[in-house]
């Protein structure tokens, strides 16, 4: 018997990340080869023409799983009865724009979208925020949707996780698909902390195999943290395909399950690891049946604690900068 279609919203749907995302969703890369989807595509009024072109291309792919599309500039239409949301659209940082101005501009966007989700989305919806600053944008959307469980919201830190896994695999001479128990803690920003103290590949402890604290501190952590800037420098544009891929990875694991593997997700803190409750913070989790379970009781040494403090302080500053907008 055919499955009922899953409704999936994508915001910023005429943008570059969405262009790398929607075709993969429609092909079955997110939910598998037998799950039909209906795409709800949201973008600004002035982007509706370009969005129409994206929809023409989606039609021309003749995806058997694409059961329908909705194009709109109204969040309440876009989020009506959705099962999954990818909040990709965000205000980019303009020339001369201060970080607090960027936070304020995005607070307006994600307050409106959070309220719309609160009003019309399914109560079981899973909403991933991709648009930067992703952790704080997700926090704003969550706070603006008080009738939805905080567990409905996550921010994307999987791109950092994938970047770290690729770099670790190259350093250790292993297949990236074999790397497990890697963690990315904190904010999706250069302050995040990629932590391979527990990482394994093929039964080997990677920290023992690499055994190079200077490389960890001076090469690995800063390179992962600045990878997005390096892509912009080389490509002349920000990461789009890799961001879309990470969004698919994170939501697929969230909805379908991680099969016992540790994955990194930025989720509202429950107070564990000394992170104040409610802050959207990257932590190691396992997922099954849409339920996220934090990996508990991991040892935090002095260096790890110092890195957690750096990224936590940044998130606290971001939260304080937009607190008056949520009052």
Curated annotation (Swiss-Prot):
Pfam families: Ldh_1_C, Ldh_1_N. GO terms for biological process: malate metabolic process; tricarboxylic acid cycle. Keywords: NAD, Oxidoreductase, Tricarboxylic acid cycle. It catalyses: (S)-malate + NAD(+) = oxaloacetate + NADH + H(+). Substrate binds at residues 93, 99, 132, 163. The keyword NAD applies. Its EC number is 1.1.1.37. HAMAP family: Malate_dehydrog_2. Catalyzes the reversible oxidation of malate to oxaloacetate. This is Malate dehydrogenase. It comes from Acidiphilium cryptum (strain JF-5). The lineage of its organism: Bacteria, Pseudomonadati, Pseudomonadota, Alphaproteobacteria, Acetobacterales.
């Amino acid at each position: 018997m055919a499955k009922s279609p899953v409704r999936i919203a994508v915001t910023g749907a005429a943008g570059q990340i969405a262009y790398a995302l929607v075709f993969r969703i429609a092909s079955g890369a997110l939910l598998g080869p037998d799950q039909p989807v209906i795409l709800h595509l949201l973008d600004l009024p002035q982007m509706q023409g370009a969005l129409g072109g994206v929809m023409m291309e989606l039609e021309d792919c003749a995806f058997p799983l694409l059961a329908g599309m909705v194009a709109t500039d109204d969040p309440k239409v876009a989020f009506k009865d959705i099962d999954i949301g990818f909040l990709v659209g965000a205000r980019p940082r303009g020339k001369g724009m201060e970080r607090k101005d960027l936070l304020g501009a995005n607070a307006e966007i994600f307050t409106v979208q959070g309220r719309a989700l609160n009003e019309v989305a399914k109560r079981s919806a899973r909403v991933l925020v991709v648009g930067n600053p992703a952790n704080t944008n997700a926090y704003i959307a969550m706070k603006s949707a008080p009738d939805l469980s905080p567990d409905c919201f996550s921010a994307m830190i999987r791109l950092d996780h994938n970047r770290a896994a690729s770099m670790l695999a190259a350093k250790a001479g292993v297949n990236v698909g074999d790397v497990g128990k890697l963690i990315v803690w904190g904010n999706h920003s250069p302050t995040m902390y990629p932590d391979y103290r527990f990482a394994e590949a093929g039964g080997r402890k990677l920290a023992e195999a690499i055994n190079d604290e200077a490389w960890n501190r001076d090469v690995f952590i800063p390179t992962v943290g600045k990878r997005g800037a390096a892509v912009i420098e080389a490509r002349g544009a920000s990461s789009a395909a890799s961001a879309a891929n990470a969004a698919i990875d994170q939501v697929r694991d969230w909805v379908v399950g991680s099969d016992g593997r540790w994955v990194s997700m930025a989720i509202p803190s429950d107070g564990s690891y000394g992170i104040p409750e409610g802050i959207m913070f990257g932590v190691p989790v396992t997922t099954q049946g849409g339920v996220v379970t934090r990996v508990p009781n991991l040892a935090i040494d002095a260096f790890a604690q110092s890195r957690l403090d750096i990224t936590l302080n940044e998130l606290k500053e971001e939260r304080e900068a937009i607190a008056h907008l949520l009052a």
